[in-house]
């Protein structure tokens, strides 16, 4: 059996990225995502659980990959997240958008902005002026040409592309393998979940 090709991240995480968790964390999980993508929507609670279980042992990074042809509202949703980020509320908006990804119209975005506590005048101005559009499009171009991202979610763990299922068991296994120094001690809840999920998969 041939060994799967290892695909490495070319554009490393920088201060421009939206990152949650310490830079010193032993594992960094990066997601290329799309707020309108149903697969990303399904992955969202799984990734949230991974982040909760690992705490400061994980750094989570999100990069936009809107696909307007198949997800026509994904680009405006990405702009809304960036506008929220300019007011230090990126992650709050990130959660709102994924929780309500079936409702991403202009009025919906404004409502979520109010819900997370943004300055609504500033948010409306940034959205009307497409303040973050060029940045999102440039990042998308780099994702396509440098990383060869073709769909979402695309996940990297410690700069190596993850090709398994986007479920808790698979991600925790991959994170454990990526923790070369053995610094992560999975909490009891994570170990229990891995055992239960493993039994379920085996039937």
Predicted regions and their residues:
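C-terminal cap of thioredoxin/glutaredoxin-like
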Residues: 45-49, 111-203
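Residue-level signal for beta-strand positions within conserved beta-sheet cores that form or flank
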Residues: 25, 56-58, 151
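Structural alpha/beta surface segment adjacent to cysteine/selenocysteine redox centers
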Residues: 30-31, 35-115, 119, 185-203
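Soluble periplasmic/extracytoplasmic beta-strand elements of cell-envelope proteins
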Residues: 28, 61, 154-156
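Short gly/ser/thr-rich secondary-structure transition/capping motifs
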Residues: 9-14, 134-138
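A short beta-strand-turn-helix
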Residues: 10-27
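N-proximal helix/coil linker or "cap" segments that precede and/or mark the start of modular domains
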Residues: 1-9, 184, 190-192
């Amino acid at each position: 059996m041939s060994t799967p090709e290892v695909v490495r991240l070319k554009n490393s995480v920088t201060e421009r990225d939206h990152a949650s968790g310490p830079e010193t964390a032993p594992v960094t999980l990066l997601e290329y995502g799309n707020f309108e993508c149903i697969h990303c929507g399904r992955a969202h609670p799984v990734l949230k659980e991974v982040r909760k279980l690992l705490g400061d042992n994980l750094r989570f990074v999100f990069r936009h990959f809107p696909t307007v042809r198949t997800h026509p509202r994904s680009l405006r949703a990405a702009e809304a997240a960036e506008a929220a980020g300019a007011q230090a509320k990126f992650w709050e908006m990130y959660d709102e958008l994924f929780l309500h990804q079936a409702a991403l119209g202009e009025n919906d975005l404004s409502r979520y902005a109010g819900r997370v506590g943004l300055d609504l005048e500033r948010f409306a101005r940034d959205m009307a002026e497409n303040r973050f559009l060029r940045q999102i499009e440039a990042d998308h171009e780099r994702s396509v040409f440098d990383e060869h991202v073709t769909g979402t979610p695309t996940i990297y763990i410690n700069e190596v592309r993850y090709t398994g299922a986007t479920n808790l068991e698979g991600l925790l296994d991959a994170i454990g393998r990526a923790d070369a120094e053995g610094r992560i001690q999975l909490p009891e809840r994570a170990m229990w979940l891995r055992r239960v999920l493993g039994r379920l998969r085996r039937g």
